[in-house]
């Protein structure tokens, strides 16, 4: 695979290899055959970052080969959304001959939605002044005149200039309902929107007969929390990143949801609060004992669950675990399988044509 070519004819073979690999990794814990969720074979990534290369009068996007570190020119990027590909051409055309926009520009980040909105961030090794703002405003207006719903942001050391806003609102159809998700520039969002819909619908399906409340750790912008509210009486969710918490609060209001409570704290801190080890001012007014959480949802970073959180989640009858790293999932399962069994297993092909696997397991108490 190269940035400008996807081996789409190999899609089924690479997916079958992942299924076999996941099944082999999970064999010590489960004999289940993974439920498999396919990605679109192209134009599946909703965000992308590129370095910019200045070559005389020419200017173009580049990526670096992960093995050789050699520079690769990228004029089209079929892994990314059609809108990103359109914007890549438009941005180069708009910046190449404009000194204020081009000078010291070293990176462009693109964030798009299925609803065809975009935020484009231009990163500089220079101070951004009024001349830059005027040039960027003219470029934004020219892009909008082409029918592109785009917002531009300029970034430099200790500087961020938003011409309008630093977010876009995604609208995802999830199991018959549209959910609005505010996505903030430079914050984590699910990169493969089509796969995200399938992940949300799978999580809904495996928790459809749930009782009581849901506790979610690492909730981000509320991606899973908002979808899962319909299966639970209440949802209590934790997140540490301020922009994600703000986006989650907006999403709760935008979707008219009244049974989700977001707490800004790390999973490790929440574990201490639940165990009565420490008291936190952020929990004033929230009676944790009121919640009857019989299901816990975790979507941890690549490092997986720490040992204290492992112990904490074992107290719940059902654990729904979305993993972006099956190796750390299996490490966690060495502990979790002492008290729980794997009752559902899914593979989500979030990043086709790569080694990367995303998977989901539902664990039920023995």
Curated annotation (Swiss-Prot):
Its EC number is 2.1.1.-, 2.1.1.35. GO terms for biological process: tRNA methylation. The active site is at 324 (nucleophile), 358 (proton acceptor). It is an enzyme of class 2 (transferase). It holds the Pfam family tRNA_U5-meth_tr. Keywords: Methyltransferase, S-adenosyl-L-methionine, Transferase, tRNA processing. Gene3D superfamilies: 2.40.50.1070, Vaccinia Virus protein VP39. It comes from the Bacteria. Coiled coil: none annotated. One of its GO terms (molecular function) is rRNA binding. S-adenosyl-L-methionine binds at residues 190, 218, 223, 239, 299. GO terms for cellular component: cytosol. Dual-specificity methyltransferase that catalyzes the formation of 5-methyluridine at position 54 (m5U54) in all tRNAs, and that of position 341 (m5U341) in tmRNA (transfer-mRNA). HAMAP family: RNA_methyltr_TrmA (MF_01011). Belongs to the class I-like SAM-binding methyltransferase superfamily. RNA M5U methyltransferase family. TrmA subfamily. This is tRNA/tmRNA (uracil-C(5))-methyltransferase. It comes from Salmonella paratyphi C (strain RKS4594).
